[in-house]
Amino acid sequence: MINMRKTHPLLKIINHSFIDLPAPSNISAWWNFGSLLGVCLMIQILTGLFLAMHYTSDTLTAFSSVAHICRDVNHGWLLRNLQANGASMFFMCLFLHVGRGIYYGSYLYKETWNIGVILLLTVMATAFVGYVLPWGQMSFWGATVITNLLSAIPYIGTTLAEWIWGGFAVDKATLTRFFAFHFILPFIIMALAVVHLLFLHETGSNNPSGINPDSDKIPFHPYYTIKDALGLMLLLLMLLLLALFSPDLLGDPDNFSPANPLNTPPHIKPEWYFLFAYAILRSIPNKLGGVLALLASILILLIIPLLHTANQRSMMFRPISQTLFWILTANLITLTWIGGQPVEQPFIIIGQLASTLYFPLILILMPSAGLLENYMLEPKW
């Protein structure tokens, strides 16, 4: 009798995706993050679903409902801590996943890469609207500052901002619609993740060497299921350590105060995973220029496949490109640090220097390094 998983219409899809999938024999732990992101998404959806059962999206009761969840709902404190810190783990995995893609040249699978960038933008949108929901000071002012950026768009900006707000400022209508967006977006992310996998399985995975691995494939199960399980254990360990021992480590103390439109916090800043983009936004004195730089800092990922000049796919054997990659990483860490600092010297100039370096690194220096490495590897005799 033929194995049911190979014949049943539904099980067959699962089998071809997670069991009998031919995978390169040499993919490292950097290839674990896809499955970890899937787990993060499921954790966020499940904890979010239970939180939504007790949350009220009204300006008068939103803050109190979150306090009620933490105090009175069975394990409500745990749900909230897992949800808040799960978002941080989600973004850690996302950034590492994107970094892996850049380092090993995975972006040359253009469809998979472009869907991935759309996924990144969708997750960022979801996290932003989610941060507004507890209706603390930083929630309210973060929403006000970021949505207000839309007003920088010429001609239609103010109308657009008021349309998003549902009024003349961030208020009850804004909170209600943000809750609706925050509920629906994770399911859109799930659908996009399926499309992402669909495109990936059309070509098969890349591998650290960047060489076509078709001659040496192994089944996904048990080799990579057990490898992913190890990554999963480490992820859950980190998440639980964060959620149980220092749940407020990555949050903002201002968010423990209810939203007050009459009192502006001394330093408005988003969650840590948006700080790099926020630093780029702030480093440009012009409002519209800042908004364009903010968008460009993320959308630049879409043109990375067009900037690939090297004969080799991966950076594994390209030391100059490797050096530039790690300079880019250090640059992003610097921007993240600057985004969390007040707008004063020396932070202003450091932020401007880091922002100025970010774009030439990707647009000029890395493609030039690829060409230089091609020249160095050409036989000269």
Swiss-Prot record:
Co-factor remark: Binds 2 heme b groups non-covalently.
GO cellular component: mitochondrial inner membrane; respiratory chain complex III
Membrane topology classification: Multi-pass membrane protein
Cofactor(s) needed by this chain: heme b
Protein name (Swiss-Prot/TrEMBL): Cytochrome b
The UniProt record lists the keyword Cell wall biogenesis/degradation: no
Family: Belongs to the cytochrome b family.
PROSITE patterns: CYTB_CTER (PS51003), CYTB_NTER (PS51002)
Transmembrane segments: 33-53, 77-98, 113-133, 178-198, 226-246, 288-308, 320-340, 347-367
Xref: InterPro entries: Cyt_b/b6_C, Cyt_b/b6_C_sf, Cyt_b/b6_N, Cytb/b6-like_sf, Cytochrome_b, Cytochrome_b_C_euk/bac, Cytochrome_b_N_euk/bac, Di-haem_cyt_TM
Gene Ontology biological process terms, A to Z: mitochondrial electron transport, ubiquinol to cytochrome c
Keywords for this protein: Electron transport, Heme, Iron, Membrane, Metal-binding, Mitochondrion, Mitochondrion inner membrane, Respiratory chain, Transmembrane, Transmembrane helix, Transport, Ubiquinone
Subunit annotation: The cytochrome bc1 complex contains 11 subunits: 3 respiratory subunits (MT-CYB, CYC1 and UQCRFS1), 2 core proteins (UQCRC1 and UQCRC2) and 6 low-molecular weight proteins (UQCRH/QCR6, UQCRB/QCR7, UQCRQ/QCR8, UQCR10/QCR9, UQCR11/QCR10 and a cleavage product of UQCRFS1). This cytochrome bc1 complex then forms a dimer.
Gene: MT-CYB
Annotated heme b b562 binding sites: 182
UniProt entry tagged with the keyword RNA-binding: no
Protein residues bound to heme b b566: 97, 196
GO molecular-function terms, A-Z: metal ion binding; ubiquinol-cytochrome-c reductase activity
General function of this protein: Component of the ubiquinol-cytochrome c reductase complex (complex III or cytochrome b-c1 complex) that is part of the mitochondrial respiratory chain. The b-c1 complex mediates electron transfer from ubiquinol to cytochrome c. Contributes to the generation of a proton gradient across the mitochondrial membrane that is then used for ATP synthesis.
